[in-house]
Structures are given as structure tokens and as C-alpha cells.
Amino acid sequence: MAFDLLPLFNSTFEKYLRGGFVDNVSARVPLFNWLRKSGAMAGWDGTGKFMYEEVMTELPDYLQALGEYEQINLKPASGLENVRFNPKEIVFPITITFREMDANKGKERAVDLIKSKMKQAELAFAEGLETMLFGDGTDQAGKVMLGLEAIMPDTNTSGSLGGYDRSTNTWIRCPSVSGAKTTLAFDNLRAKMTNIKNTCTRGSIKPDIYITDQTVYEGYESLAFGKYTPTDKSGAADLGFSGDLVFAGKPVVFADKIVAGRMYALSKDCLKLRVRGLKKSDDSPFTIEGPFNMMPHQRAYAWVITVTGALTANMFRQLGKIHSIS
């Protein structure tokens, strides 16, 4: 009977989810991978309808130089606002019919079936999470997470975030500049990257990564032509660049789901992916529930893989964007 395999299915699902699942998703989503590896993923206890990030709106301007017998000014520091972010629940169902179970009764075949189902889930989460993390939060009738396009619009004085209007609240604006060419393709890219890096720098805190689309990435790579020797160790001509690209010592990477002509300069101190139940940044944020017996409507069992959280920001002035790159 199909239910005889349930203990095997349950244990294998749990083992796979705790093991390679999150690594395989990370490998396909550069932004998710960076958030995870840099310590920018954080836990959320799941209480309340919203998450809140405390944002400094202005620097305290009354640091006191104390004279002899002078009274200390105990006025509490002001200039803090709580910006709300709405956590979203993202799910992917895995359904296995009784017929599939009966056709895969042996342990090896059952495990192969589970791996195939989990591979589908990996690809679904990789595609979906990347789309959300770079999006504006309007897909699926607004049920998806807010992404970078919502947090960092091209025009940084337009729209609102967390109940605060950017036109009147300068502290919620991310630096944003145009990277349009003057004459030749990408002739302004390096200068704009330097500008956005410096604009987002506060002391030793600088952007940790630059993420763009494939076309801009290849344009940036083309700027390096003539600056490296295109040969391998054997002396054979190698016209492809195999090394990693960096800018000011920080990685430059590309992703599939970025809006064309965009580049984001991000800092791990200013951007967080907060996930319900997460204990450590490199832990898996995914959970699985089930099996759910679908009878009498369907002769099948279902499991549901879930991640619940939100992409949040705090120091907006240290998150930069170059748009309209050409």
C-alpha cells in the first residue's frame, strides 16, 4: 500500500531539506546566496502582522562638551523611525499520487522519485525568489515579497515605503544615478560605479557587492580587455576571461531576473532578509509540512515547503543603484 512508504518519504524529505536543498537554491540566486553567506539573513519570531526596522532619520546634533560642574543634558536621542515591512509566506506543494508510490516501491526508486520532486521545488524557489528579491512587490496581486525595485526605485523621491513618503522623508531615499552612455556603450559605467560607491560609503563601511544583469556584466567585463593576458599556462590563446570580476575589491555578479540596465551596490549592514524561525544566517530558511492525505478528492499525499519573511532595509543612504545603463 502507498502509505507503507510514508516514513521513508518523510525522512528523506527532511534530510534533503536540511542538506543540499538550500545550497542548491543559493547556487542559482546570487542575491540570496550573498545574503546568506554574508550574515545578512536574520531570524524573525513570527509575532505581529509586520516586521519593523528602526531607521535613523538624522544624526544627533547635541554631543555635549562638559564643563566643570556643568549639568549633563539627559535629553533622549531623537531621529529614529520604525519602518514596517510586510512578511509574506511563499509555498511550493509537492504532490505524490498513490500510483506514483506504487510504481516506486523499492527504496532506491522511492528516493529517486523524491529527489526528482525536490529538484522541481529547488528550481521553483530559485526562479521565484530571484524574481521577488529584484521585483517591486506587485506580482501575484501583491502577495510576493517586496524586492529591491520597491526599496530602491529609479527616482528616489517618488513613491513611499513602510508608510513614509520619499518626497518628504529624505532619510528613506537610496542614492540613484543614471548610467546612460555618452557616445560608446558603457563609456560612463566605471565612473558611475565609482560615484555610487563613494556616495554610499560611510567611513570604512562600503558596498559589499555589485549585482547587475548579464548585458551590463559583459559590458563591465569588456572594460577589462587589454588589462590581462589572454593565454593559459600552456601558452595557448584563451580569449575568454575565467576569473571573477570585482570593483574596488568587491565582487561584481549578474543575475537573471534583474530589470535590464540596473546595477545595485549593496551592503550587508543595511539590507536583511528576515525569515521566520531562522537561528543562524547560513541555516536553511525552508520548512516542510506534511504529509496531507488528499482523499477523497485525490488519491495522493501532499507536502508543502514554505519560507516566510521579508527583505528589509535600514540605512537607505548606503544602498545605491545605477539605472538606465547603456
What is the role of each PLM region?
Residues M1-S326:
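Flexible, glycine/threonine- and acidic-rich loop/arm segments that mediate assembly and lattice contacts
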